[in-house]
Amino acid sequence: MRKIDPLSLKPHWGKSILKLTSSITVILFSLISSLTAQELPTPDSLYVSTQCFIREGNSFQDVVEEGREADVSGPNVVFFRQPIAGSDAAENQFIRIVVWDNMEHWASNVVVTPSDTYDCDNNNRRFWTNRNLGSNRNAYNGTDVSLVTTRRCSVQRGYNISDVYRSLNDTQLAREANGHTSVMHVSHLLLGPSSDTEMRTSIIIRTIGESEVGLARDLDSSFQTDLGIGTPANAPAEFCNDPSLSRSYMVYS
């Protein structure tokens, strides 16, 4: 019987091991990618935000009353948000938020309702995917008016919206464990004007009170802690500004 030199098998072993290692690497990478994708839920809604301006001779209350009397069908909810601590907002300026399921829902039903009391910059609307954070879902609890804070940030280079979601979700769960009742969202800009930022890096962190008093109480609780200065070094977001405060009116639901 012919003897086989063990040394002649080594190259074949090396090739087999290399193939096995490559296969394992591909499988592990696929599993990690799959797990990461599963951690980011699909958007809960689509927010379409538009800057609007009250016409001379009208008040914001006139705008709200007209909005509530309008014959609207299609969107899930419409909010009018009046700046209280805004970002250089004009005296007659407010934001209209129209909530849809997704882009298809918007495209199937979108109608610009004419108004006698205000005008909107409809050519520069912004489209945001919106995800709920934590477990609180009690915004506007028994009321159609509440307070809302919004903080604009950019996704830090090297991170993605999944990283932002996980970080903010952990933050919100910790707040809820400490008794906070407000709802938190993260919105991700996909369409519309975005000044001085790279594409798809603009986000808004939004907190909505179960009522005006509810959000004020949660803010008081936050203000009593040792507030950090600037965006945390380990956060997946950067260039976060100080939050704005608005009074939000639900005009259609």
Which residues does each PLM region occupy?
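N-terminal secretory signal peptides that target proteins for export/translocation
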Residues: 1-18
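Short non-domain terminal segments
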Residues: 2, 27, 35, 77-78
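Low-complexity, intrinsically disordered regions enriched in charged/polar residues
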Residues: 3, 11, 25-26, 162, ...
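Intrinsic disorder/low-complexity segments in short proteins, especially the signal peptide
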Residues: 12-14, 23-25, 36
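Bacterial N-terminal signal peptides
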Residues: 19-32
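Short S/T/G/P-rich N-terminal loop/turn motif that feeds into the first structured element of a domain
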Residues: 37-253
